[in-house]
Amino acid sequence: MGDRLAVSIIGVLSFAIVFVVGALLLGHEPGRPWSAEVAALPALNAALNATSAALLGVGWAAVRRRRIALHRACMLGACGVSTLFLVSYVTYHYLAGSRPFTGTGWLRWVYFPILVSHIVLAAAMVPFVLTTLYRALTGDFVRHVRIARFTLPVWLYVSVTGVVVYLLLYRLR
């Protein structure tokens, strides 16, 4: 596959992912009653985000030590876990909708900036993750490293703040 086709596919896929998630968050009314399984999904999502963050950290440490096979395994694992997260996240919001934040006082001043930065960066990073992955899989390591220097810290931030948002929304209310 040529770079032009890959860029087109990455663009369409990124748009589709962001569009579906945005439509669910902004315009979808859940149509099914809650169940124990649905209620468990936010905790699962936080666990998937934490796993992704751990894999990203280990993968970064591995590449710094020139342990390329471990780096590759961790980064592919982070992609897989993030994909599972996306499926679980979309499923939860399709079935349950969004949960309003009920915290007050200083907690609101902490929660909303974290939430906004998490949402904006999560949406913006989709094409960067896909491009970084594509460049690694095609052996274009010079350009892979160049974009990964940006992608990794943003992806790590999004993964960690996903856990923080969960804790603030479901545990520290």
Q: What residues fall within each predicted segment?
A:
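Alpha-helical membrane insertion/targeting regions
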Residues: 1-173
